[in-house]
Each structure stands twice: as structure tokens, then as C-alpha cells.
A protein has these predicted regions:
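C-terminal regulatory domains involved in ligand/effector binding and gene-expression control
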Residues: 2-84, 171, 189, 205-216
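Hydrophobic side chains in well-ordered alpha-helices
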Residues: 46-49, 158-161, 192-195
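Active-site beta-strand/loop microenvironment that shapes enzyme catalytic pockets
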Residues: 86-134
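Terminal alpha-helical anchor/extension segments at protein ends
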Residues: 127-132, 147, 200-216
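Short glycine-/aliphatic-rich beta-strand segments at the starts of folded cytosolic domains
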Residues: 136-152
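Short amphipathic alpha-helix segments
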Residues: 149-167
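N-terminal positively charged helical leader segments and presequences
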Residues: 176-177
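Terminal, non-globular segments
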Residues: 182-191
Length: 216
């Protein structure tokens, strides 16, 4: 199970992202366009990957990029290309696929023939779409990580309740009472907590650990 600790102030109920980076290259009028995709969770992480690409292609004329994080935080750069011809088409490509927490960098080696603003928009947008189409995607859902101590008498009832509510048990400790650590979808977490209280006759039996985006 893949999980991502939620550190954003405004939380989405879920989003689709990519699981790993991909590569795509195409040529237009002797200009090389080399596209990379990366899963990122912060601006710091995005800038780290951008630096790696600049180091890998130090002699390229342009390192154009765009990223979307947490569904609403976005940034892009044309890196010397005419305004709006590079970074914005990349952002639009990411948004058109309803992706978040994604960085796309498109490196251009100029081939000596001007492409015009329309040609540049086309190539940067195409590079982003193609590399994102190659990237494996995953749906992440906002979950609550919690732990609870369960007595052996009620253990089977708790397991049945968790199964019906789609909760995922992460770990089980059988020392003393049974200690469960689990992930519950945010949308059903209040109901699960109430059922814990009803079954265990304890209104303070659940400890909330964190909010996380997970594959459930």
C-alpha cells in the first residue's frame, strides 16, 4: 500500500498522480524536445528534479517545466522561450489529464529553425502529453491513520466492522490487549470511530495519528 503524508493546509478528498518518472523524445525541424515526468510532493522536490535535468543537459538552450501540487498549487517557467509558449502548455497538459503532484520538464536543443509561437506551444504541449501518457498512474484517497486497543472478546466484531467499512489494517500487536493500527477513508472515519466507541463502550478508544493519501 502506497501512502503519502498529507502536509497541505487544504485537503482534497483524493487525486490521481503518477507512480514513477518517464521519458519521451521527439524532433521538430531539427529541434530536439526531451520530456521527463516526475511524481513530486513539494516545490523543494520539484526543484531538485529540475536541477538534475539541468545538470544532465547543461548545453541545452531551454529547460522548460511545469508542476501541479495538491491540486491547486502550480508553477511553470518558459525558461527563455516566448511568454506562454512552454510552461503553460505543460500545465494545461497536466490539468487536461486531471493529474496532481506531477512535474514535467521539457528540454529543448535548438535546431536552427524557428518554430514560431504556435509551433512551440504545440511541441511543449505534445511532449508533456506524451510523457504523461507513458507514465503509470494511481488514484490516492485521503485517509486517516489511527490506532485502537481492542479486547479479545470484541475482536471479531471489530474485524467485521472494519471489513464492512473498507478499512485497512496496517499492523496488529497482540501484547496485552490487541493494538490495531489502520487506515480509514476520511469520508467514513467518523462512522468508524463511532462504531469503535459503541462496540468497545469507550468514547476515547481511538487515537488519530495522521492524515495521509493512500491507495485503498
Amino acid at each position: 500500500m502506497r501512502c503519502l503524508l498529507c502536509q497541505c493546509g487544504e485537503k482534497m478528498s483524493g487525486f490521481t498522480t503518477i507512480t514513477e518518472g518517464e521519458y519521451f523524445e521527439e524532433t521538430e525541424k531539427r529541434s530536439r524536445f526531451i520530456s521527463y515526468s516526475f511524481p513530486v510532493n513539494s516545490e523543494i522536490e520539484a526543484m531538485k528534479f529540475l536541477k538534475q535535468i539541468k545538470t544532465k543537459y547543461p548545453d541545452a538552450r531551454h529547460h522548460v517545466y511545469g508542476y501541479v501540487i495538491n491540486g491547486f498549487s502550480e508553477k511553470y517557467s518558459d525558461d527563455g522561450e516566448p511568454s506562454g509558449t512552454g510552461g503553460l502548455p505543460i500545465i494545461n497538459a497536466i490539468k487536461s489529464m486531471n493529474l496532481s503532484n506531477v512535474l514535467v520538464v521539457v528540454v529543448r536543443y535548438f535546431g536552427g529553425i524557428l518554430l514560431g509561437t504556435g509551433g512551440l506551444r504545440k511541441m511543449y504541449g505534445s511532449g508533456a502529453l506524451n510523457v504523461l501518457n507513458l507514465s503509470k498512474k494511481v488514484k490516492l484517497t485521503l485517509c486517516i491513520r489511527m490506532c485502537v486497543n481492542v479486547d479479545y472478546h470484541n475482536y471479531s466484531k471489530i474485524l467485521s466492522m472494519l471489513s464492512k467499512n473498507g478499512a485497512k489494517i496496517i499492523s496488529t500487536d497482540y501484547l496485552g490487549d490487541i493494538k490495531l493500527e489502520l487506515l480509514v477513508r476520511k469520508e467514513s472515519s467518523n462512522d468508524v470511530i463511532k462504531k469503535f466507541s459503541d462496540i468497545l463502550k469507550n468514547n476515547e478508544c481511538v487515537q488519530i495519528l495522521s492524515n495521509e493519501y493512500c491507495v485503498v
